[in-house]
């Protein structure tokens, strides 16, 4: 991981901050684009450019004399290596470490003004930060419409994609746009909303059954939409749409307008509402609570705007039967590629004594995946990590700067793919030599947590926040009556996953984030289950499956509530030599045996003639 000298960049940025018309003491540089995307296109990587830190999550704050970068536990190690001496690392979530918001407010004391590009920050965060700055003695938060990082970046800034947008046919989507619009309009009428303005790219893609490739690994395209009771307007670069997409949108009564006209139309909506001047409380324009501050300002602010959890996001998170079956099928094909890969990798390292680096291994896995039916591409950068690199939770191997895979060390592979019928995300941790007793114990405690959550049964209305501890319990203590381990991991246990959409999908998830306590899990949700353990500088372990939430039959029905459970769809065995059978209960061994039996059955006939892979699969799935 390379450290970038940011001195010249910061000097230029600070100069721009002092210019007439701007005149700010500090500036916030978020990770997101104008659509609050977690993963962004290269042209939107402003925070990475100005700080040198390339992780996917983080916020930079630059003042005239200081600079800070805040990120979460997944990236502490990486940020520590990439940030140069100009930067102070704020380790989010650690005791006595201020949030970036508190750090900014404190730095603004004495009547100072802090600026931000309003299109890159959500209005709830912006408004709360403005209050905090003023309470700390600062002048407040200023919307700076011209992004100040862009001129620092200059001609080196990548151009925005002009990739085509394609229709996702009903065979894969399971529901047409007209039906989705009808359901959305019912929700809007129920809540007396005048319109819903969509700004999240995956929500627009899902609603209109379109897919693009403007952001690497995410099949989305730059777009907005406005839906009222009588109209639906898609704002997109019209030249990207082919005849099939245009015809489909026309059939579903969708108007197409240029992407850049959204804010003009938003201001027109605000003007129309102002002119209406009714004595009754006006129906408001609904926007996502992740929507940008710029969008809210354009729509007239609090007078005409209500920020809500997106009804489109909620609907998208509950997959229909076609999407669920697609998830099952694409995970079988994905499992074929992964099993072939692990068998190949072991043969190369152990039998052929080959020298392979982490990138070469990741490239081989991608090549195997690409042979599977309906493969589109990867769903994120493959984390191919050996030894101490596996302790870096979101490690990214770089060509020419990565490690040689050590067969006597832990190897962690977190990878996923986009298929026309679904999205995959799976992590397996392996050892090709002789693991230590400590490594086997850690792996088995993580596995026990994975099994505990996979087999959990819970009443409808339960949140991911409430069941997070099931996956961590064995790291905390092996059992209630034995050794208190005192171990844990610094990431969520699970995230929602899209259907041929973003690999990280809200609003549901499993973990300690506040949002996971606000949204109940529902039948049709698809989530990851991925507990882990990381020994910095030594090794890392993570075991990740994707699972669907489904109704389960129970002997009783307390309070007439249905009960829910999980159906895992990942079809890849666990690393047998890392499992300490002495730590497993009889029930856990039986669960493993049933899981291995299912994998063998679903892989039957898929490796004909490939004796190496078949032998590896049979060995790894032998009964305990």
From Swiss-Prot:
<dbReference type="InterPro" id="IPR029149">
    <property type="entry name" value="Creatin/AminoP/Spt16_N"/>
</dbReference>
<protein>
    <recommendedName>
        <fullName>Probable Xaa-Pro aminopeptidase P</fullName>
        <ecNumber>3.4.11.9</ecNumber>
    </recommendedName>
</protein>
<keyword id="KW-0464">Manganese</keyword>
<dbReference type="InterPro" id="IPR050422">
    <property type="entry name" value="X-Pro_aminopeptidase_P"/>
</dbReference>
<dbReference type="InterPro" id="IPR036005">
    <property type="entry name" value="Creatinase/aminopeptidase-like"/>
</dbReference>
<feature type="binding site">
    <location>
        <position position="544"/>
    </location>
    <ligand>
        <name>Mn(2+) 1</name>
    </ligand>
</feature>
<dbReference type="GO" id="GO:0070006">
    <property type="term" value="F:metalloaminopeptidase activity"/>
</dbReference>
<dbReference type="Pfam" id="PF16188">
    <property type="entry name" value="Peptidase_M24_C"/>
</dbReference>
<comment type="similarity">
    <text>Belongs to the peptidase M24B family.</text>
</comment>
<feature type="binding site">
    <location>
        <position position="425"/>
    </location>
    <ligand>
        <name>Mn(2+) 2</name>
    </ligand>
</feature>
<keyword id="KW-0479">Metal-binding</keyword>
<dbReference type="InterPro" id="IPR000994">
    <property type="entry name" value="Pept_M24"/>
</dbReference>
<dbReference type="GO" id="GO:0046872">
    <property type="term" value="F:metal ion binding"/>
</dbReference>
<feature type="binding site">
    <location>
        <position position="414"/>
    </location>
    <ligand>
        <name>Mn(2+) 2</name>
    </ligand>
</feature>
<keyword id="KW-0645">Protease</keyword>
<feature type="binding site">
    <location>
        <position position="530"/>
    </location>
    <ligand>
        <name>Mn(2+) 1</name>
    </ligand>
</feature>
<keyword id="KW-0482">Metalloprotease</keyword>
<dbReference type="Pfam" id="PF00557">
    <property type="entry name" value="Peptidase_M24"/>
</dbReference>
<dbReference type="InterPro" id="IPR033740">
    <property type="entry name" value="Pept_M24B"/>
</dbReference>
<feature type="binding site">
    <location>
        <position position="425"/>
    </location>
    <ligand>
        <name>Mn(2+) 1</name>
    </ligand>
</feature>
<dbReference type="GO" id="GO:0005737">
    <property type="term" value="C:cytoplasm"/>
</dbReference>
<dbReference type="InterPro" id="IPR000587">
    <property type="entry name" value="Creatinase_N"/>
</dbReference>
<keyword id="KW-0378">Hydrolase</keyword>
<comment type="function">
    <text>Catalyzes the removal of a penultimate prolyl residue from the N-termini of peptides.</text>
</comment>
<dbReference type="InterPro" id="IPR001131">
    <property type="entry name" value="Peptidase_M24B_aminopep-P_CS"/>
</dbReference>
<dbReference type="Pfam" id="PF16189">
    <property type="entry name" value="Creatinase_N_2"/>
</dbReference>
<feature type="binding site">
    <location>
        <position position="544"/>
    </location>
    <ligand>
        <name>Mn(2+) 2</name>
    </ligand>
</feature>
<keyword id="KW-0031">Aminopeptidase</keyword>
<dbReference type="Pfam" id="PF01321">
    <property type="entry name" value="Creatinase_N"/>
</dbReference>
<dbReference type="GO" id="GO:0006508">
    <property type="term" value="P:proteolysis"/>
</dbReference>
<dbReference type="InterPro" id="IPR032416">
    <property type="entry name" value="Peptidase_M24_C"/>
</dbReference>
């Amino acid at each position: 991981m390379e450290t970038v000298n940011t001195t010249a960049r910061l000097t230029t940025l600070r100069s721009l901050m002092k210019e007439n018309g701007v005149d700010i003491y500090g500036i916030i540089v978020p990770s997101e684009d104008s659509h609050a995307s977690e993963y962004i296109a290269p042209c939107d990587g402003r925070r990475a450019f100005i700080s040198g830190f390339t992780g996917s999550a983080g916020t930079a704050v630059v003042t005239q004399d200081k600079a800070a970068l805040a990120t979460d536990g997944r990236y502490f190690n990486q940020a520590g290596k990439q940030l140069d001496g100009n930067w102070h690392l704020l380790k989010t979530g650690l005791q006595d470490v201020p949030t970036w918001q508190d750090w900014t407010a404190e730095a603004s004391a004495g009547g100072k003004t802090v600026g931000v590009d309003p299109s890159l920050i959500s209005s709830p965060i912006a408004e709360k930060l403005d209050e905090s700055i003023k309470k700390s003695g600062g002048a407040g938060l200023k919307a700076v419409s011209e992004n100040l990082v862009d001129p620092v970046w200059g001609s080196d800034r990548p151009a925005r994609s002009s990739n085509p947008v394609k229709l996702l046919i009903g065979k894969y989507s399971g529901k047409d746009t007209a039906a989705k619009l009808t359901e959305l309009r019912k929700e809007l009428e129920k809540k007396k909303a005048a319109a819903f303005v969509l700004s999240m790219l995956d929500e627009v893609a899902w609603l209109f059954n379109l897919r693009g490739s403007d952001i690497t690994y995410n099949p989305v395209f730059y777009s907005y939409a406005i839906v009222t009771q009588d109209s639906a307007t898609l704002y997109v670069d019209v030249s990207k749409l082919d005849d099939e997409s245009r015809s489909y949108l026309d059939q579903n009564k969708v108007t197409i307008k240029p992407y850049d006209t959204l804010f003009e139309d938003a201001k027109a909506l605000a003007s129309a509402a102002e002119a209406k001047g009714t004595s009754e409380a006006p129906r408001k324009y609904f926007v996502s609570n992740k929507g940008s501050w710029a969008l809210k300002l354009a729509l007239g602010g609090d007078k005409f705007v209500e920020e809500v959890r997106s009804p489109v996001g909620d609907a998208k998170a509950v997959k229909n039967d076609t999407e669920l079956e697609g998830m099952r099928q694409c995970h079988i094909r994905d499992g074929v590629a992964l099993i072939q890969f692990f068998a190949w990798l072991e043969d190369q390292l152990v039998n052929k004594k080959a020298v392979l680096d982490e990138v070469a291994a990741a490239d081989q896995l991608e090549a195997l995946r690409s042979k599977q039916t309906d493969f589109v591409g990867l769903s994120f950068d493959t984390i191919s990590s050996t030894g101490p690199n596996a302790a870096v939770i979101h490690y990214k191997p770089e060509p020419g700067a990565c490690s040689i895979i050590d067969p006597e060390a832990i190897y962690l592979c977190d990878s996923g793919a986009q298929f026309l019928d679904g999205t995959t995300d799976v992590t397996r941790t392996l050892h090709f030599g002789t693991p230590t007793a400590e490594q086997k114990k850690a792996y088995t405690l993580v596995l026990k947590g994975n099994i505990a959550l996979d087999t959990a049964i819970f009443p409808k209305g339960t949140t991911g926040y409430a069941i997070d501890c099931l996956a961590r319990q064995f790291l905390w203590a092996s059992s209630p009556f034995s050794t208190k381990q005192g171990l844990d991991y610094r990431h969520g246990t699970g995230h929602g996953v899209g259907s041929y959409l973003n690999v990280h999908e809200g609003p549901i998830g499993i973990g300690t984030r506040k949002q996971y306590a606000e949204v109940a899990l529902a039948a049709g949700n698809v989530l990851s289950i991925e507990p882990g353990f990381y020994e910095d500088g030594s090794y890392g372990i993570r075991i990740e499956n994707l699972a669907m939430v489904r109704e389960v039959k129970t002997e009783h029905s307390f309070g007439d509530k249905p009960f829910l459970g999980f159906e895992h769809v990942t079809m890849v065995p666990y690393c047998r030599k890392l499992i300490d059978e002495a730590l497993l209960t009889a029930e856990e061994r039986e669960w493993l045996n049933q899981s291995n039996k299912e994998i063998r059955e679903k892989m039957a006939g898929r490796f004909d003639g490939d004796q190496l892979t078949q032998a590896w699969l049979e060995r790894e799935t032998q009964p305990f």
